[in-house]
């Protein structure tokens, strides 16, 4: 949003700082500025001149004009404006000599657009001012552009008077106010106002004027609006925009002769109510839209835009001037619903001060008497409002303020700063201020003492507060064993080449059916974020399955895992949330066994005492490759291969663990085992078994015969093929034996090996040694 430097200076007469340093101060103490635009550069040299003679130039649409520029002398100028004629007073700018249409032109006659006064390119500007003088009421200006996002909490800063108040406070200068409330007429209003819901419209003020003359605005008014990015239209509409830009109070003018009845209604729109706006757009409304209406229907969308049917026109002679206050959220909803944001709606959305409505009318009276001579007020002010209690004073202890600021500050300085910002300040108790918040800061900005700290801090300058590290006690936060355990699990799988995935906690009916789960036992979401995410997941498997199928389209092999919550329904209370790990090992080539063994190895890394026990396959598991993972006799998860019907190509091994059970069964004191002083010995054994025999079953059998000297037994490899018979495989294990007390003799090692061989043969297995 743009602020005119000259306009601000009118409210702060003692302002001597140029626009650039002022912009820096505003950025540091009030709101972020985005830059400065120079306005009306040509006005520096332009002077009022009279056209004396006009001659056509052969073969050209231009004319040669001789002008009297007062002290600048008589000049010959080439001009192409259609309104260039003898006797007209216009703007002459001595920009230098140039040959135009074969004639030397000494300077130029300028249009309003070239001067920056308005957008009129159609002809040279016509003036009524003394010869040789600068353009009256128009001098070069600087528009300071403020970032709108930095003033969303400051409704008062959406007008020049509010910004001028900030400038006056920053520089310690007095502030003037152009709104003269004593201009407001007393007496019976010429129009009535009826508000249906005072919460949606806390205040509605209106005045009626007659003997109105609608005409172009004076140049100073056009220039003032153009400099801040508003388009001049006519004197009545321009006046309402001027008041809005000055006081942050949007206003609207209705042609009184086009209104039906003597009452203005503020009410919700009727369902299907039809409305044609000033922008010629047609809208169909509903009760969520607040409207201004007469006896025939809606004449304006409250706080957003006026209606075409009551617009000010060239023949308007009577005007109803509206100055109202609307609920911020109501205006925002209507603006969003019709996809239209206006200068008025942007201000109302910031929660404007209801007391500002009559100030806007007072300022309008003064302006209208200047720009529409002969205008007359009819009746008094129509003013319907809700009584809004004044906010209670805020207690501000000086010691607390200093502690929050991080620096010392005198009580007199605090009082000076707050009073310069129009806060009322008293000190009923020594060292404790009682601060009264002005109405324009109480709507959504200042409510607690912490807000006052910000006011004082920004005015003394945050750069004046020396940085200091906070003095806080350093203590170790309490640990979260579950989080730490999951962190360790995550690191284990990442270190072994797995990629972590994150899936939604929601499932579709289709994915549930694919695994044969009972959707009736799951929690159904009443407002799903998508049609295929209506069930809370009671298993992480459908999610990882979808990851596998999608990645299998692009990769030969990959490893994925997810740590998340299974959500199970309870009969009463909140759902039961169980942390689970699910890991997938996919390979497009091979028989899938490496994936199963790798996942089994990682399970053993988490649970050294885990056992793999063959289990009956579920419908989504490979019929011959399913096992339970058990620790101390309890099942903590499953290891299996996905059924081929779920994986089009390749094989996918899955590890599914209940992390809560795993953590509880593996928790305990970590015991230190001294490094063995005596060497261990290792030997390999290969067991011949059927293809369906589980390696875990064979390993458990070998361990049962190894006796107390065994230290570890590890799976080495599996072989199928010649010279083995069909249906037979060779499974190799490495057994390590030793003693903490002595080095084992070769006889003891042989005894262990023989015990294993005899025991396995007794079970019907043949060994290759």
From Swiss-Prot:
Belongs to the phenylalanyl-tRNA synthetase beta subunit family. Type 1 subfamily. Its cofactor is Mg(2+). Tetramer of two alpha and two beta subunits. It comes from the Bacteria. Transmembrane segments: none annotated. PROSITE patterns: B5, FDX_ACB, TRBD. NCBIfam families: pheT_bact. GO terms for cellular component: phenylalanine-tRNA ligase complex. Residues 676-768 form the FDX-ACB domain. Binds 2 magnesium ions per tetramer. It comes from Solibacter usitatus (strain Ellin6076). This is Phenylalanine--tRNA ligase beta subunit. InterPro entries: aa-tRNA-synth_II/BPL/LPL (IPR045864), B3/B4_tRNA-bd (IPR005146), DNA-bd_dom_put_sf (IPR009061), Fdx_antiC-bd (IPR005121), Fdx_antiC-bd_sf (IPR036690), NA-bd_OB-fold (IPR012340), Phe-tRNA-ligase_IIc_bsu (IPR045060), Phe-tRNA-ligase_IIc_bsu_bact (IPR004532). The lineage of its organism: Bacteria, Pseudomonadati, Acidobacteriota, Terriglobia, Bryobacterales. Pfam families: B3_4, B5, FDX-ACB, tRNA_bind, tRNA_synthFbeta. Residues 389-467 form the B5 domain. PANTHER family: PHENYLALANINE--TRNA LIGASE BETA SUBUNIT, PHENYLALANYL-TRNA SYNTHETASE BETA CHAIN AND LEUCINE-RICH REPEAT-CONTAINING PROTEIN 47.
